[in-house]
């Protein structure tokens, strides 16, 4: 029987079930929990690539990630995020961000399935609730941000963390730039939709925009909005890119994750 266990402050939830044996009612509950908590995770899920793909399709159309090659010709939508103990420099995604916001149609959801992880407590993924960030935003700041969009680039601050991985297993692409509204309405709730790792500027330009930019990017990642996920082998996490920021944490060791993004 499916069981939902919310984390403190309702930032994320663990769901206890077997992903290979789900009813239609179970799927509805999982989707509802994802919208409510922003990120959900499932332990002890020994999924094949085929079953992983089939599960992901329940959430929408699978996307192709523009910066890394797929797992294989059969599974191009699964990208491998790997770090070796010999790797130097920052981990892939080691700055708060939301995935592929620099595209015209960014993915709504991201899935990560752990295949190989270092010791417990290392290589966590940190999440930051943008529902809470929006609720705690001063009214005068909300009014200013309602009038502008954010400009985002694939060559933003976080791009330094992708260069080594792209060099190894990726493909060169031209800089991608897109603009999006700062706020998103998801069901009945609002969230800040701004990726610190890709943010370049506001459009149109506004008075005191540098000060506003610094305030916004600092506000979004306050500790009181955060949850740190400890990975175990064969653990699956799904998060809503519209309501959650995430980042990798620094670590040494070997890790292999299989990633899917969904429109």
Residue ranges and their predicted role:
Residues 2-233, 242-263:
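Non-heme Fe(II) oxygenase catalytic core, chiefly the N-lobe of the double-stranded beta-helix
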